[in-house]
C-alpha cells in the first residue's frame, strides 16, 4: 500500500493527464485520490509545492519503468539498447500513457522544472552509448531522446489509432546509432 504522499502524487499525475495543468487543484487531487477535501493541501500547502512533488513522483516512476525494462542491467549491445528503448516507448504510450500525457503537460507548463530530469536521462543515455562504443555519444544521446519524445507524442496524438511497431522503433534507433 503506497504511503499517503505517493497516493496523492499518483492522483495528481492522473489529474494532469486527464485535465491538464489548469485542472490541477488541491480539490481535484483530493477527488482523484478519493480522500477528504483538504487532504492534499495538508501535505502540499501551495500549488507550487504540489507541482514540484508531482514532478518528483514522475521522475521516480520513470526510474522504476527503466529498471523494470532492463532488470539485468545496462544493455550489452546497441541492438539490446534499441529493443529496450522500443519497449519503453510502447510502455509509455500504452500501459503508462497517462504518465506520458502528464509529462507533456508538465513540460509545457514548467519547462525549467523538467529540464534537470531531462538532462539526467540524456546523460545516462550518453554514458550507456559511450560504454557501448558509440561515437559522438553526447550528440547521439540527444538524437535518441528527441526521436523517442517525438514518437511518443505522435503515438498519443496524430497516430493514436495505429498500432505501435516495436521493431520499427528499434530499427530507427539502430539507424540513429549506426557508425
Task: List the predicted regions and their residue ranges.
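Helix-turn-helix
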Residues: 7, 11, 15-53
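Hydrophobic/aromatic-rich alpha-helical bundle segments in the mid-to-C-terminal region
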Residues: 115, 119, 130-179
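Amphipathic alpha-helical packing segments from all-alpha helical-bundle domains
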Residues: 63-64, 83, 95-102, 109-135, ...
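Short alpha-helical scaffolding segments that buttress acidic/His motifs in well-ordered protein cores
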Residues: 89, 102-107, 144, 148-151
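Hydrophobic alpha-helical connector segments
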Residues: 66-99, 144
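Actinobacteria-biased recognition of intrinsically disordered, low-complexity terminal regions
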Residues: 1-6, 178-179
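Alpha-helical DNA-contacting segments of helix-turn-helix folds
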Residues: 51-58, 114
Amino acid at each position: 500500500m503506497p504511503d499517503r504522499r505517493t497516493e496523492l502524487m499518483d492522483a495528481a499525475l492522473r489529474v494532469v493527464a486527464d485535465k491538464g495543468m489548469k485542472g490541477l487543484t488541491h480539490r481535484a487531487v483530493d477527488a482523484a485520490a478519493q480522500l477528504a477535501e483538504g487532504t492534499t493541501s495538508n501535505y502540499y500547502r501551495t500549488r507550487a509545492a504540489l507541482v514540484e512533488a508531482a514532478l518528483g513522483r514522475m521522475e521516480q516512476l520513470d526510474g522504476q519503468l527503466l529498471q523494470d525494462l532492463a532488470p539485468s542491467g545496462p544493455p550489452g549491445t546497441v541492438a539490446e539498447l534499441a529493443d529496450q528503448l522500443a519497449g519503453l516507448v510502447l510502455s509509455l504510450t500504452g500501459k503508462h500513457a497517462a504518465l506520458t500525457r502528464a509529462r507533456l503537460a508538465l513540460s509545457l507548463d514548467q519547462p525549467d522544472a523538467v529540464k534537470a530530469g531531462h538532462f539526467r536521462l540524456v546523460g545516462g543515455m550518453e554514458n550507456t552509448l559511450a560504454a557501448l562504443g558509440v561515437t559522438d555519444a553526447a550528440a547521439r544521446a540527444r538524437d535518441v531522446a528527441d526521436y523517442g519524445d517525438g514518437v511518443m507524442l505522435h503515438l498519443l496524438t496524430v497516430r493514436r489509432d495505429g498500432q505501435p511497431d516495436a521493431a520499427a522503433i528499434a530499427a530507427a534507433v539502430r539507424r540513429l546509432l549506426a557508425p
